């Protein structure tokens, strides 16, 4: 997926949209992600021992994140493939070679996913072990916010808080807290806090005081690209999907330091010692051209997608994992005007193909609007659709029902979070569908004047001022390989952090592996708790991977792919008997436990 931006706009200002635009962490999971590709790589292993594995669910794609604490593993039972049996599996791993099911915590109507963490907090109100989980509503009775459980006795967890979080939306009170994509908690001495990924608002960094877990309260919320505009990368033009996806907080030299994975704004370092007054420390930019594909001879723009990151044990480095499920990017132009069209692929072209045709304005293409006129089956016609009122899927269905079109381009609506902003899109249908393009580009296709200032002020045209059925400029769209998501090694420093190296599995930037071998993007990294140079990766169908930092480079030193393939989501280290083990969650199976056996 390649996306772009004309002018300066924030991709997630205001309240989150529900039409399929990708402007929050949860929306990334709807974009043919987390299980969109079949097949797998062949079984192989090197310097990694499989200690044990335990099947937890027979439904493919049901298992999500994993956390480990004091001899127990906690695995999310996700709602992305159905809302049945959502909750948290508790697994006894006190004997890593013989894991066994210990308990299940149901979350009826809601589903945890990325946010699974257990820790000890000791405050005046509570002294014990807690589990924090995120909630994304998937069915009746679901709640948003986070859940907090007392797992001091892991076999008999007790609910301390259910569905607590931000109970406002656009400054209006709501009955349910905002849905959240992830959560991370920390003990700050006499107080304890948790940070939540708000899926529904531009202020998507929500910080809760959980000193008394049964009385958790919201103490601050931030829109990082508004609070710290220096994190927004000016070029290339495609880095516009700006929102929080995940984060960790670590005590470094007595300060609570967060690394926030802020998608197309990269990785952001913040001092959150005082949650009510957070301070900017540094952030990353995505190198252009993208350095990892360049190693394979490809010259492409960086994808962005800062998904998850961790500090190394010695805090010298930050390792970031970019999640990218689209190995093909889009190039698009207005042929008549010889100008770029900045849009992503909602429904992609066939890999390596192109589509060129004349444009036809079809309005909003919503049910009840002016009917979409039929295209000409004898020519290549591209339906140009205005965003607004209904979902992208409804628009596509109406264009397809009209017949005669070969592709669809959606351009943006009015609104403070729209106008000349560009966003990705989640949509279902058959015809290749591109968008969401900046509003000015939609107007230009039909030679209409446009003022972004008027659009943002609400004084510009509320609809493209041409009749439905009007023909416009020629446009061309082409698909090119740009590879899967991969990892970065950054120096932990103030200001713009230096990118030292990138790491991808060999298949990740080989067009021969663009389909038929599963999702070959990285998902998460867990750094070693005993060595400063080791890191472990959950690499979806790429398996379990181990890297070592050598001379400021990420070098693979081990891997494991099971017979029949893997689909790893989460990864977490834990100690046992003086040895470091690694728990990994396989989305289609359950829990794997590994040990790195390479040279020390």
Spans of model-derived segments:
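Feature marking well-ordered beta-strand scaffolds used for ligand recognition
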Residues: 5-334, 383, 393, 465-600
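Structured lumen-facing ectodomains of secretory-pathway proteins
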Residues: 328-480, 491
